Regions:
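An N-cap/entry alpha-helix motif that binds or orients negatively charged groups
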Residues: 1-15, 76-84, 88
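N-terminal amphipathic alpha-helix/helix-capping segment at the start of soluble metabolic enzymes
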Residues: 6-27, 92-96, 102
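Active-site mouth loops of central-metabolism enzymes
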Residues: 22-34, 110-124
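Active-site cofactor/substrate anionic-group-binding motifs, chiefly glycine-
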Residues: 42-57
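Glycine-rich, proline-tolerant flexible connector loops at the mouths of alpha/beta enzymes
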Residues: 54-65, 140-154
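A gly/proline- and charged-residue-enriched helix-loop-helix capping module
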Residues: 58-102
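Single conserved hydrophobic/aromatic residue that forms the stacking wall/gate
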Residues: 156-166
């Protein structure tokens, strides 16, 4: 049963966005379940949607540790995880194994591999969009990694080919 959220019961209002019927408005963003190991459990806790990842085409170990830095004087924490994940093949296996136990909306956060140039990033994204097409209800294209040089600039190379593929 849903133990955390009273919102876990279907809202009386219709929560239909972009053709998807969300059970409720409370979800989990990418980063918590990087490898799609327990998204189905998060659904049982009452989340109406869960985003897994960020997932890259090939497995990545992420940045060297320590990856999380606390600055007490500024009351801040900075993460520089580096998209550590098991890669698309294993992540898809995990999703396929657990999706039958999940009734919410499943998002897949995708990112370019660190060995791929920004000019070729669209190739990774297009492959990942195609690879997860049968299991993802929506995608989040993660271009926010602050420790990947000029990743946001790769949006120029990503946007048109990605839009054309959809």
């Amino acid at each position: 049963t849903n133990v955390l959220f009273s919102l876990s019961k279907r809202d009386k209002k219709i929560n239909k966005y972009f053709g998807l019927d969300f059970p409720n408005k409370v979800g989990v963003a990418g980063g918590l379940d990087k490898n799609a190991n327990y998204f189905h459990v998060l659904g049982k806790l009452g989340f109406g949607f869960v985003e897994v990842g960020t997932i890259t085409l090939k497995p990545q170990s992420g940045n060297p540790k320590p990856r999380i830095h606390r600055f007490s004087n500024e009351e801040t924490i900075i993460n520089s995880l580096g998209f550590n994940n098991v890669g698309s093949v294993k992540a898809l296996e995990n999703i396929e194994r657990n999706k039958k136990n999940f009734s919410g909306i499943l998002g897949v956060s995708i990112g370019k591999g660190k060995e791929i140039s920004n000019e070729r990033a669209h190739e990774d994204y297009l492959h990942l969009l195609d690879y997860f097409k049968d299991v993802a209800d929506y995608y989040a294209i993660n271009i926010s990694s602050p420790n990947t040089n000029d990743l946001r600039l790769s949006l120029i190379h990503i946007s048109e080919p990605t839009r054309q593929s959809l």
